[in-house]
Amino acid sequence: MFKLKSVNLQVYIMLIAIAVIMAFFSVATDGAYLSARNISNLLRQTSITGXLAIGMVFVIISAEIDLSVGSLMGLLGGFAAIADVWWGFPLPVTIIATIALGLIFGIWNGWWVAYRKVPSFIVTLAGYLAFRGILIGLTNGTTVSPISGTMTVIGQGYLSDIAGVILGGIAVIGFVLWGNYQRRSRQQLQLEVSALSKDFTKYALFAVIVLGAIYLLNDYRGIPFPVLVLAVLAILGLFLSRKTSFGRHVYAIGGNIDAAKLSGINVEKTKLIIFAMNGVLVAIAGLILSARLGAGSPSAGQNAELDAIAACVIGGASLAGGVGSVFGVVIGALIIASLDNGMSMLDVPTFWQYIVKGGILLLAVWIDTSNKKKM
């Protein structure tokens, strides 16, 4: 019960932080920050960091780390651009080939970590350097452009207004039905359930946020496709982490690897799958990045791994392993993107942007360690 209350408190703190950040930048930019156009851009920024953070949180929960995701995202995005611009591959072939490469590179990292017992810090640091080198070699150090119109839709396309409203309605109905299903399941198991008024408040708040966001986005061009991709990945990640044996194994390994082995969990196989899955998510983020930029760049993805790790830590994941949630890291990614977007609108110097994000990351880790000492 204490753990549940701590998690809920953490979520509330993150939501309050987002509200404060948005209120501050809205005042500082005379309302431009909360314009439909900027919110659309902000959510598209979040989709890339969010996709990386969803993969990263599984790695961190298992008490590992991946420093290569930024370079790998740049490499896979660059490969997608080359396949589209230089080789003229059809879009489905480009997508499949890019995701397959992400899977292969993820398995490569996972094999060294799980079966060769090389620390993930070293393996992925090597990948951080090697993947960037491969990208520069493939592109000859030049920008690959222009990407075809069919591919740019991935990063720059929008859902129609009507389709967005219908999708939002389905999301709200699905959320309510899922909440009722969980409530009945707990009642059948004679477990404690929250008051109906509290559930209704939660449903109403969810509906206001989702439908309000859709209304705002429709005031510009509609829901961006990258946001839909992030939503699907988040739902799949939530299901995988909460409702499958794989998810329970990941938490068990991060919490106590020796106990996990004694309970019969195949630690090596699980870690290999974690890194393979991370590679696939990096590939998806790379596709969105290149499609959004309309080009593949040898510098693409620089420092993206730091944003992903920061999103995880801000979202409640512990670098010691065993703790973290997909929902939390998506909120963390939104916080990171909100700061980047707001400071860019205010023309804050780059060095100050790094200092601010570094300070927030340090504060998040300090809060996490302080909470652990109290427990």
Swiss-Prot record:
GO cellular component, one term: plasma membrane
Topology with respect to the bilayer: Multi-pass membrane protein
Keyword Transcription: no
Main location (coarse class): membrane
InterPro entries: ABC_transp_permease
GO function terms (MF aspect): transmembrane transporter activity
Regions that span the bilayer: 9-29, 52-72, 85-105, 118-138, 159-179, 199-219, 220-240, 271-291, 319-339, 348-368
Subcellular location: Cell inner membrane
Pfam families linked: BPD_transp_2 (PF02653)
Keywords: Cell inner membrane, Cell membrane, Membrane, Sugar transport, Transmembrane, Transmembrane helix, Transport
Protein purpose: Part of the binding-protein-dependent transport system for D-xylose. Probably responsible for the translocation of the substrate across the membrane.
Family statement drawn from the similarity comment of this UniProt entry: Belongs to the binding-protein-dependent transport system permease family. AraH/RbsC subfamily.
Name of the protein in question: Xylose transport system permease protein XylH
Organism: Haemophilus influenzae (strain ATCC 51907 / DSM 11121 / KW20 / Rd)
